[in-house]
Every structure is written in C-alpha cells, then in structure tokens.
Amino acid sequence: MLLFLWIETSSEYFNFDWVTFLGTGYWFFWSIFILSLARILTAYSSLLLLLGFLLLWERIELYLHLCHKILILLVILLCVILMFIICKFWKERWLVAGLSMQIFAPYVHLVSITVMVILFWPVAFYVACLEREVRMRRYRMTHSEKKRLKQCNVITRLRGLQVPVGLPFLLILLGLYLMPLGIYSPCIQEKENLGPKPTIFGHRGAPMLGPENTMMSFEKAVEHGAHGLETDIHLSYDHVPFLMHDFDLKRTTNIGEVQPESACENPAFFNWDFLSTLNAGKWFVKPELRPFYNMKPLSEADKERARNQSIPTLADLLTLAEKERKFVIFDLHRPPPKHPLRHTFVRQVVSVILASKIEQHLIFWLPAHDRQYVRSVAPGFQHVGRLVSIETLAKNNISIINVDYKKLFPNGLRDYKAANIHINVYTVNEPWLFSLAWCSRINSVTTDNIGLLSQLDHPHFFMTPKFYVFMWLLADIISVLFIVAIFCFHWRRETEKEKLFETSSTRTDTQSGNLHIAMKPPVRVVEGPWTLAALYPALPKSGKEHQGHFNFAAPSKKLLPIKNAVTPLKPGKHEIQPPMPTVVFELTQAPTRQATSEATFQTTLPTLKVDKPTMPSIEVPYP
C-alpha cells in the first residue's frame, strides 16, 4: 500500500525534495531514495513470503534466519512510522490513492481476477486433500463405538478446516465479480462525451527543459505549445518585480559564490542592481542539482544557453507573453516586514502590468489582496479564485478557480463545472493524472512536464462502457472456466489416490486372512548325530510345541538309566576324511504380513568312509 501510494504521488516529488532542501540545505532526490527503498523492501518481503509458501507446499519445516527476522522487524517498524507520518501530516495523500483508483480500478479489477485464479490452485489442492482425508478416515473407521466417536470428531475437524479456507476465497471472488457495479471512472464514457484536451500552463516555464523562472524556460514552454505561463513574483527593495520561487537565493543562483553570507536572506531585501548580476542557470546543468530525476539530457547548445541565464523581471515575461499572445498567471508574494512595499505591493505590480501594454484579458489575476482596487484600475483582468463555495465566487464575480489536483476527488468538481466555472488544476506532471483531468472535462492544467503532456492526443486508460462490460464478462467467464478446471483436476487426482488406497487396503485384508490358515509342517526332520535325541534316545519326545521351534520336555523325576545306544565308530582301513557338515536351509515365508516365518530345516550328514558304520535316522513327528 505504501509503495503504491508513493508511486502515485510522483507529481509531488519536487515539492518533497524542496522541503527537505529547506530543512537540510542540501539538494538530494530523497523522493527517489524512498521509492527505491520501498521497492527493495517490497521485493524482499514478497520473495521471502513466496519462499515460505513453496516450503510449506513441499511440507518442509520453516526456519527463519536471525538476519531475516531482524530485517522483517525493520520493515514492519518502517511501515508503521511512515503510515503514522502520512496519517498525521499528509492526510491529503490518501486523496491521491482515491484518484488513482478512479482511473486504475477497471484494470485492478481484471488483474485481481487473474491473481485469484492463480491462487485458486493451492486452495483447490488443499480442499481436495482434506476431502480425501475425510473419505479415507471414514473407510478405515472401526466398529468400536469409542473409536468410532473419536474418528467422527476428527472428521468433523477436517470438515471444519475446509470452511475457513474455501469460504473466504469464494466471498472475495464473488466481490471481485460484482466489483464493476461500484466502480466510477471518468475515463469510462462514450467517445462523443469526451471533452476537449485541457490547455496547458507552463509551471515556471518549462523547468524540465530550462532553469525555472528564466527566459529560457518560458521560451521552451512557448515552443512546446503552452497556452499560458505560470510564475512567482517577488519585489526587490527598490520596487522592481522579478521572478523567483524560493524565499532565498541559495538554490537557483550563484550567490554562494558571490556573497555567501547573504545566501539565506530574503531576496526582497536586495536591490535590483545586485540581483541582475546573479547567474540563474549554472546550477541547472550540474547533475547533482537537477530539479527532476526524469529530466532528459540537455544538448550542448542548451547547456551553454542555460549557463548564461539571469533573473528576469516581470516586464521581461510580459513582453514575451504579449508577443506570443500567451496567458499569464502568477503567485504574488507579499514582501516581508520592514519592506517599503509591504502594504502597496499589489498596486506596484498592477502599474508594471499596465505599463507593459499587454492585453488585459491575458492576465489571470490570482492574488486576493486588494482585489477591488485591481478591478477598478484594470477591469479587463480575468480574476481567479481559490476553491471556495460557488456562492462566494458568484458574489465576487469570479468565474475561474485554481485548485490542487487532489481536489478532483471524489466527484471531479462536478458542481463547479455545472455552474460553468473555468477550472485550472496544479501541478499535473503524470500522463495518468492528465488523462484523468481530461476525462473529467477540466479546462486547463499547470505542469512541469510540458514536453510530455503536450504530445498526448488521446487520454490514457480511456474505454467505452460497452467495451468495459465486454471485458468484465469475458474475464469473469474465463476465470470461472479456469477455476472449475483446476478444481476438477485436483478433485480427480485425489479421487484416484483414494481408489488406489482402497484397492491396496482390500488386497492387504485378503492377504491378512491367510494368517489363520495352518501351515503343514514337514513330515520328516533328519537329526544330526550331535542332537540330544540322537545321543540320548531315552529322553521323552513329547513337549509343548511353539510355532517354528522344537522344545523338548524336561524329563520326569524318575529317570531310567541311560544306556549308550550309539555304536562307537571304528576307523576303517583307509584314511578317514573329517566330516564336513553342510547345513542347508530352505526358508519359505508365509504370504501374509503378520505370519511368522516357517522354515523347513533339513540337515544332511556327509558320508564317512568307515567300516560299515551305521547311524539310523531319527524321525521326529509333529504331534
């Protein structure tokens, strides 16, 4: 929001830099610095948010480094401070946001719908996953009442998660679909209702093409088709009206080189003889002192011409205006206390104007001081008022007003246009703002950027109501189709996962049934000569059997004498080869997951070369 607000107030950048110059004494593009900082912080926060979203999407645990935590806290603190400053001291900046929404709202609507379609992808995925989880839990629900109630509570919670995720999204989307019903934009109208292009007054001439309030600047404005010239007038100590905006000579003259101790004094306390010797153009060609960041580079001829500029008088401007038949409007600054013209400055300026022989209707008289005297001695002047009530303007016989462009919000000064009052707004430097004034049927604007605005032959962002309705319905229909397609895609994919789960569960249940089928044990187990049964045949063979193991029961208390029933082996005539027992295990696992492995153990005794020794095999039957 802060970035958007600062971008839209670009017409105020010069005033902001000028105010900081008055406070610091150093000219710097603080407005551009704040804009760049806001863009960097916005990009950083957006990338961090996007990274966090992607990590959550991949189900990776989030870990925010300490540096990121500090930067996020600084961003939040800076936003809070700037928001406080704007709400406390610059409340009118919110009017700029309102004006920008009047012209950008149709495009914001279309972009917002596109963004909502993109955001619907994770929303649909999450809702579909929750639905699949609910169905899977229902499928696995046991018949036990206690577990059943517990499962039902889990399902209810899962259902409840779908509401806060899907419902706000649908409400916002519905609001966007109905948003055009509440949009008011002056640039949405029929072509035949579009008013003429506003005429342009050069603000201090053409300050982007030449040093402000110099003859070069005014001549550049005339070359670019200015309808009128705007300036600021001070009176020297010896009664000469001259053109100067600031209340000192530090920024726009070389007084720091000529008389540095007087750089911060009011120019009204200097005589014209001294003021006429000051250079008023060298500062303009210095890159670090250029007044506008987006100025075009000057040619070498213009640079040389700017270096030779001096402070002009009001008479010089009137001569140019009379020659080119241009209107003149100016702010007249009252001299400070102890000035000889403190109370008669208006009459002095009027006498200079009348002496110039300029046609009186070319003068737009803006000062409110001593207006009755001006009417009496110069009845041909066109008197300009401020933004006061229509009744007050009619009482003072004023049919022209000069207002700040922010006053166009909210209704574009409809009442004044209905009263047939000529409206001039200042200071309009951006094409979108000029287009808004054009669509609002404003009569004239005052601008610093005459080079750009004079080239516009059609307002930007203009569209007819039929075209906008077509774009509105087309965007809504396309978005609905995309949303339905995305939802069906996720729903179908989760349904396939659910079916796959059910199939695997059914197969598992079938295999689990095999756990109850008894496995036939092997009929015969060959015992080796080292087993107890072979060595002690008198031992009882009955015992409690465990699956997969052979357990021999303990002998009774009364044991029979054990006879050695094994015939001792006698070596043969030939060399006896040592026995090499080989144990072969054939392991057959049950097909079920829970079955205990059953194995058939088969022990084979290798043949011994002896004199016909015999070892009877012992069969151990299963009970």
From Swiss-Prot:
Compartment(s): Membrane
Keywords: Glycoprotein, Hydrolase, Membrane, Metal-binding, Transmembrane, Transmembrane helix
Gene Ontology CC annotations of this record: membrane
Pfam families linked to this entry: GDPD (PF03009)
Disulfide bond annotation, renumbered to this chain: none
Glycosylation sites: N308, N397
GO biological process: lipid metabolic process
Protein's UniProt name: Glycerophosphodiester phosphodiesterase domain-containing protein 4
